[in-house]
């Protein structure tokens, strides 16, 4: 026993034993030791902090794992002290220094080992990637050599040709178990993923050289299809999954073939449950023929019948909202006189938030449809708003809004040959109008004599004015009164006749153009208007005599009693009421 005590390892083990619990202690002693943390009051354990109680309970029930590092360091220090390498008072300092050094260098070694491990893993992954890409790198070099032999530009379909070459590069890069190599003057692409398949790239591009951008008719594509070789078809089939509808135009023949191949490859995976069900049904019916089974599968997978479109209708709540929108929009249009778009916005603002929140999709779709209808065809929008029984068309429910186009009112849009062959009733009306025009022309020929009877001294250019009697009264002398028209002249006066339509819509469809030409012909420049204004007439002999005698005021332009019925607009209109100085003497 004394020999064991002199052993540094045994002594270190004895020195490192904890002063608390041992594995050989009884549970009663363990509980007594835990409860007797306070020697004076055993019941004070429950008054200890929760962390202290929890730590003591855990350590008593499940002891901590022993770490032999400090025991080994302590054994080394005891051996050094026995061999007198260190003094006993230096044992504690050496023990602490050794523990710190072990902790420091052990952690450093762990980090170094981890760094080395990470570096080794990265190097292994890099080597694996390089080993896998050795074949693809060689294939890319061979592919670039092949593409260097091909022309960079083609006569037509340049965009399709460029996208096809890009898809070929992508296929060579991404497809595993494939390679591009040269054998003689030709280049080949070989893949062994799903069976060994080899494509002669040189012959395939030579065959496709004249087909880039070719647009074959939809009905007959057999003429173009006969130009493709099986080698070219295989290349199109292999490259189809690496293209999309935007890379190669679907209008071209090659784009159409790529689309068909892509859809066929995408639908090649048949649901096994469907296959098993059809197989079991065929066997139950006694049809063991493989051909009939394939025919059934082809019918079920390819001949899919279209479903009849469902009939849409409004429920009671949606119809109530529709009627409310119709009434509100019509009220805003008639009361405020706003535009249809503003009326719809006012209706949306005045809508109850609860009703809008519960029917938001329908209200948004309805407002969108009405806005489009108001912009495309205002007449259709007005009829839809004012019709209390109006219901949206089927396109309203599916999202494809169909609003009939509005009629712009151009008469030439509705012209046909029947317009220029008038009906008998139209001919009768034309004859009556021709007679009326002849009577008006006779009246215009007779009008200058009536002007002379009225005593008008108007210029010759004023005879064509539409108001000859008015001009005559304005330009006549102030000493004579105008003569009243007779009964026949009064009835035949052109001013009292109803306005004659210049162009009839049934017989003259370009009525708008004729009216525009008529308006433009009546336009005059400023110089023409200034030239046509009649100047002041020289005073007559009697007027000069009266002014010399001082019987007429200088600023009096219409002082005669005979000018009461004068329609002139110049001078003092009440000058005839002013007393005359000449009559007072």
Swiss-Prot record:
The modification Phosphotyrosine is found at residue 490. Cleaved near the C-terminus by the viral protease during virion maturation to form the mature protein. GO terms for cellular component: host cell nucleus; viral capsid; viral capsid, decoration. The record marks 570-571 as: Cleavage. Residues 571-585 form a propeptide. Induction: Expressed in the late phase of the viral replicative cycle. The modification Phosphoserine is found at residues 225, 310, 444, 449-450, 452, 469, 473, 494, 515. Residues 1-24, 438-475, 528-573 are annotated as: Disordered. It comes from the Viruses. All late proteins expressed from the major late promoter are produced by alternative splicing and alternative polyadenylation of the same gene giving rise to non-overlapping ORFs. A leader sequence is present in the N-terminus of all these mRNAs and is recognized by the viral shutoff protein to provide expression although conventional translation via ribosome scanning from the cap has been shut off in the host cell. Interacts with hexon proteins; this interaction tethers the peripentonal hexons to hexons situated in the facet. Interacts with the penton protein (via N-terminus). Interacts with packaging protein 3; this interaction is required to promote correct genome packaging. HAMAP family: ADV_CAP3. Belongs to the adenoviridae hexon-linking protein IIIa family. This is Pre-hexon-linking protein IIIa. The lineage of its organism: Viruses, Varidnaviria, Bamfordvirae, Preplasmiviricota, Tectiliviricetes.
